[in-house]
Curated annotation (Swiss-Prot):
Entry protein name: Interleukin-17 receptor C
Tissue spec. comment: Expressed in prostate, skeletal muscle, kidney and placenta (at protein level). Expressed in brain, cartilage, colon, heart, intestine, kidney, liver, lung, muscle, placenta, and prostate. Also detected in thyroid, trachea and adrenal gland. Low expression in thymus and leukocytes.
Entry's localization field: Cell membrane
Summary of subunit composition and partner proteins: Homodimer; disulfide-linked. Heterodimer with IL17RA. Heterodimerization with IL17RA is independent of the cytoplasmic tail. Associates with non-glycosylated IL17RA constitutively. Binding of IL17A and IL17F induces association with glycosylated IL17RA. Forms complexes with 2:1 binding stoichiometry: two receptor chains for one interleukin molecule. IL17A homodimer preferentially drives the formation of IL17RA-IL17RC heterodimeric receptor complex, whereas IL17F homodimer forms predominantly complexes with IL17RC homodimer.
Organism: Homo sapiens
Gene of this entry: IL17RC
GO cellular component: cell surface; plasma membrane
Length: 791
């Protein structure tokens, strides 16, 4: 039996938060006023306002944007000129029916126009004097019913009004505009009038209605509320988003606006009064071990649609699964598919049917765990990266430094800072150079969730470098410390750490330019200084001690001739086992077709380094390559590799095949076609003689990637040595890289699977990149099947 996890009704079941709505009978729109108590101030003719108790409207307050004041005019018989046209203010409201006008002595009065109007707000103009203006909006959900069980959802809107501006006695009649009138009105007998418009939009409905309001000028105090106008009501669809604007015409200020998401059937206590809610399916969610069941309890004849999608905070939803179904159904999901933003939409397959949505996994711990397991960091360029995840994540990221040896990655905060991360948004690193020891840490709720060393694939494995932190103070003062697992050690220092012992040498390396600057700003800098040469010096002393010991041992053996042959035999076996443990040397040559292919080559080289192989590739020797030149660098590497009994790996790509064909036809390639780091181009001058003179077998091996190049596209001259396709022929490829006389290891298949797993993310990123396809894919002679589309 499935263990009940939680039960959710999308339509027919009660929700913990349900609304019991007031019912309105009849199809006509209506409006009424809710005035405040307005009384004159005796002889001074000043104004005061006393607020009456609010009517029982149960209106939810709405925070308004900046209001637009309504233009008001003066009317009456107090001897002053009445300004018509300009003395009116408009507010866009959906008001229906024919309202009633209350006498001025009672305070605020209102009337609703009989028909909708066109909403033409116009530009903002200065107010000529005191005006009635809307100050804020309130909304309430009600039901408009034709019968007891035939109702529609409706939105009641209340607009609160106040007097804005100041009453000034005009010096002449031009201040109020227009020609003189025969009758001049006094301010105490005048009235402020306004025309208020409500604009309502809810796809596919849009309405605009006009409301006339009026209040005696002698009964109001400027800046105080004069009451509110309530409009019944705007019909809207269940679950829709509505927008309401309120402004005056002419406009004197910005309009009020409000956006509201209406509930669907499961949020209403009166769903049985709304016909569109009757046909919705009943959905239960339950768990059974590692599976989650969506149980839809509907009749056998009913047709409905079911859709699963990722709800995005920014941007449209991402559909995951959609199907039209009939009758009762049980949909099974694996628990690994659950993420917090996974939502379910269900609807009957009928015209204009209500679609109900629910996101039941927002608070599920397993869903949050799956979300972080699915999240990935992607390096786009040297300084840009993004976080790829199904849902939005509250996260922050920082750079950290990871030293070899398994020590924790140390955050570089300070001098750098934590940055907020947005999913699928490109972020920039404040770096000058990349380094394989630099990693990215992503935290959420102060807990480490994700850590990746993004530069490891392109720049090689971790290096035994030390990171120096330079801090700059006033008056050009600066201090240096070395980042170590125990903390940042000041240089120079008398501490017993490795960086402290080599502090003077590190400072000399920094001054001589042997350290790589990774980051720089006004407050400090980060430097990566190599430690290889100091390790070599230490090992040189160890080897010297070993040689002295071997010499002494040889002398003893000579003195004991009977045992000399046995000792020599054991010594020979030790030397051979040491060479085998050290691994065979492999020189990897490739054509730098594009940056994506270089990252793919870097991933292959890094994976081979995990085996008993010593891999040399120009990606990891850019400094020596620039100093020596590509021709000299390749000749030195080739000579050293072949002298040690190693192997040269020719990694063929469309660009490499084109270069080889060019050399075979012309004997030389055009200058300037590639950059100074193209070791493959430089190697052709001595690789071709090895093949032409038959010296290549046993010393050279060819390889190409399955979906990028077919082996038949490799020139026939180079097929005199084995050419393997990767990763499909990885076991044979690794077997060819072993020592010639080394026995075939039973772990060869296991190592091939290890290399394949390490290589797969780089292959996926190259053949299925985020956004746009990677350049150079499937271009060139002999591109294999599917090379263009990555299938």
């Amino acid at each position: 039996m499935p263990v009940p996890w939680f039960l959710l009704s999308l339509a027919l079941g009660r929700s913990p938060v349900v609304l019991s709505l007031e019912r309105l009978v009849g199809p006509q729109d209506a409006t009424h006023c809710s005035p405040v108590s307005l009384e004159p101030w005796g002889d001074e003719e000043r104004l005061r306002v006393q607020f009456l108790a609010q009517q029982s409207l149960s209106l939810a307050p709405v925070t308004a944007a900046t209001a637009r004041t309504a233009l008001s005019g003066l009317s009456g018989a107090d001897g002053r000129r009445e300004e018509r046209g300009r003395g009116k203010s408009w507010v866009c409201l959906s008001l229906g029916g024919s309202g009633n006008t209350e006498p001025q002595k009672k305070g605020l009065s209102c009337r609703l126009w009989d028909s909708d109007i066109l909403c033409l707000p116009g530009d903002i103009v200065p107010a000529p004097g005191p005006v009635l203006a809307p100050t804020h909006l309130q909304t309430e959900l009600v039901l408009r019913c034709q019968k007891e069980t035939d109702c529609d959802l409706c939105l009641r809107v209340a607009v609160h009004l106040a007097v804005h501006g100041h009453w000034e006695e005009p010096e002449d009649e031009e201040k109020f505009g227009g020609a003189a009138d025969s009758g001049v009105e006094e301010p105490r007998n005048a009235s402020l009038q306004a025309q208020v418009v409500l604009s309502f939009q809810a796809y596919p409905t849009a309405r605009c209605v006009l409301l006339e309001v009026q209040v005696p000028a002698a009964l109001v105090q400027f800046g105080q509320s004069v009451g509110s106008v309530v409009y019944d009501c705007f019909e809207a669809a269940l679950g829709s988003e509505v927008r309401i604007w309120s402004y005056t015409q002419p406009r004197y200020e910005k309009e009020l606006n409000h956006t509201q998401q209406l509930p669907d059937c499961r949020g209403l206590e009166v769903w049985n009064s709304i016909p569109s809610c009757w046909a919705l399916p009943w959905l239960n969610v339950s768990a059974d071990g590692d599976n989650v069941h969506l149980v839809l309890n509907v009749s056998e004849e009913q047709h409905f649609g079911l859709s699963l999608y990722w709800n995005q905070v920014q941007g449209p939803p991402k559909p995951r699964w959609h199907k039209n179904l009939t009758g009762p159904q049980i949909i099974t999901l694996n628990h690994t598919d659950l993420v917090p933003c996974l939502c379910i939409q269900v609807w009957p397959l009928e015209p204009d049917s209500v679609r109900t949505n629910i996101c039941p996994f927002r608070e599920d711990p397993r869903a949050h765990q799956n979300l972080w397991q699915a999240a990935r960091l992607q390096l786009l360029t040297l300084q840009s990266w993004l976080l790829d995840a199904p849902c939005s994540l509250p996260a922050e990221a920082a750079l950290c430094w990871r030293a070899p040896g398994g020590d924790p990655c140390q955050p570089l905060v300070p001098p750098l800072s934590w940055e907020n991360v947005t999913v699928d948004k490109v972020l920039e690193f404040p770096l000058l150079k990349g380094h394989p020891n630099l990693c990215v840490q992503v935290n959420s709720s102060e807990k480490l969730q994700l850590q990746e060393c993004l530069w490891a694939d392109s720049l090689g494995p971790l290096k035994d470098d030390v990171l120096l932190l330079e801090t700059r103070g006033p008056q050009d003062n600066r201090s240096l410390c070395a980042l170590e697992p125990s903390g940042c050690t000041s240089l120079p220092s008398k501490a017993s750490t490795r960086a402290a012992r080599l502090g003077e040498y590190l400072l000399q390396d920094l001054q001589s330019g042997q350290c790589l600057q990774l980051w720089d700003d006004d407050l400090g800098a980060l430097w990566a200084c190599p430690m290889d040469k100091y390790i070599h010096k230490r090992w040189a002393l160890v080897w010297l001690a070993c040689l002295l010991f071997a010499a002494a041992l040889s002398l003893i053996l000579l003195l004991k001739k009977d045992h000399a042959k046995g000792w020599l035999r054991l010594l020979k076996q030790d030397v051979r086992s040491g060479a085998a443990a050290r691994g065979r040397a492999a020189l990897l040559l490739y054509s730098a077709d594009d940056s994506g292919f270089e990252r793919l080559v870097g991933a292959l080289a890094s994976a081979l380094c995990q085996l008993p192989l010593r891999v040399a590739v120009d990606l990891w020797s850019r400094r020596e390559l620039s100093a020596q030149g590509p021709v000299a660098w390749f000749h030195a590497q080739r000579r050293q590799t072949l002298q040690e009994g190693g192997v040269v790996v020719l990694l063929f790509s469309p660009g490499a095949v084109a270069l080889c064909s060019e050399w075979l036809q012309d004997g030389v390639s055009g200058p300037g076609a590639h950059g100074p780091h193209d070791a493959f181009r430089a190697s052709l001058s001595c690789v071709l003689p090895d093949f032409l003179q038959g010296r290549a077998p046993g010393s050279y091996v060819g390889a190409c990637f399955d979906r990028l190049l077919h082996p038949d596209a490799v020139p026939a001259l180079f097929r005199t040595v084995p050419v393997f396709t990767l990763p499909s022929q990885l076991p044979d490829f690794l077997g060819a890289l072993q020592q010639p006389r080394a026995p075939r290891s039973g772990r060869l298949q296991e190592r091939a699977e290890q290399v394949s797993r390490a290589l797969q993310p780089a292959l996926d990123s190259y053949f299925h990149p985020p956004g746009t396809p990677a350049p150079g894919r499937g271009v060139g002679p002999g591109a294999g099947p599917g090379a263009g589309d990555g299938t």
